Each structure stands twice: as structure tokens, then as C-alpha cells.
Amino acid sequence: TQHLPYTRCKMAMSLDGRTALANGESQWISSELSRRDVHHLRAASSAILTSVETLLKDDASLNARGLDFEFKQAVRIIIDRKLKTPNQAKLFSIPGHTLIYTENDNDTRIHELENVGAEVVFLKNTESWLKEVFNHMAKEFEINELEAGSTFSGALIEQGLVDELVVYIAPILLGHSANPLVKLKELKKIGEAKQLKIMDVRQVGKDFRFILTL
């Protein structure tokens, strides 16, 4: 059997289950206290994981900041099948280790990314490529913090690669055209729905934080 890292998926949504407006605007759905809480989660993680699509959209730093205790920064991991990560991405200008998993063996692109500080891991494309990536990650990382969009997070949930959801719910309404929390395949029966177990609920600032296991 494959050994996989424990993967916690962090999400923030409105009361009507939306994460971003249709035009992509998503900043500051959750409160400042919730965002600070996320930095605690990051500090407790071995790796912070995202997709290249999320990186291209947000250019996030993927590090823990503003904490008043000592901790080791998590390794930043980008899942980037085609090596679309920009050489100028903000995270390359910040101290820390960045790891890119890809199925693209283009030596020129690999060397470009290595020159700006990335470690690039090539894994041959297979039907279970994402599981192979997670199996490889498990050699070094025990706890992953997943911070990505609804499509990538949904794909990992459907493949059984996510163990826990941390969902911040803000008391706002974004409307039916805004993006959903997670994109999963269409169900034909309620009985097919993925069951989750609520482990903890607490108020964080004006938001509520749910911790659920899958």
C-alpha cells in the first residue's frame, strides 16, 4: 500500500458556499483573525501545497507570517504538470525551499526554474499521476497544508488525497454566479454524497471555523 502524507485543505467561503466572485475577486472574504489563524496552520505544516493555476492567479507567498513564536517555515510545493510557474513568481524572492512537481521534462524550463531557486521533480505521466506525486511527497512531508482553488481541491478530494478540511465561513452572501467552494463530479443520488465528520467548530473573529475529516 502507498504511504501518503496527511493533507489538510484550507478553504474560506461565504454563508452561501461561495469562494470568489465570477470575475475572480476573492481577497478578504474571511476576517483578519481567520487569516491569522491560517498562519498558525501553515506554521504547523511540513509543506504548503498549491496548484500552478492558483499560483498564476494569486502569486501567493505560501509562508507563515506575523507569529510571535519560533517555527520552521514549511516547504512550498507547486503541482505544475506543464512547468508554467513564472520565473518571476514572488515566492522565489522569499527565503525558503520551493519544490515543483511536473510531468514536463523540458530541460530548458527545468534549468530556468532551478536557477531561480526551485527544486524540480519530474514524474512520468500516468493515470494515477497525482497519487504518485503524493506518494513521493510522503518520503519527506508528514502534514501538507493545501491552499488551492475549487477545481484542484475537488480533484484531490475525489482521488482520496485529502484527509481534513478547515473551512472558514464568513457572514456574507456572494450570490449564485460566484464560484463554489469545491468542484466535484455531479451526483445522481443523495446517497452518493461524500460524508464528512465534524471534529471542531469555533468562532474566529466574525467567522466560524469548521474542522472536518473525510
Identify the residue ranges that each predicted region occupies.
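Class I S-adenosyl-L-methionine
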Residues: 1-2
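Enzymes that bind and transform nitrogen-containing heteroaromatic metabolites
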Residues: 5-214
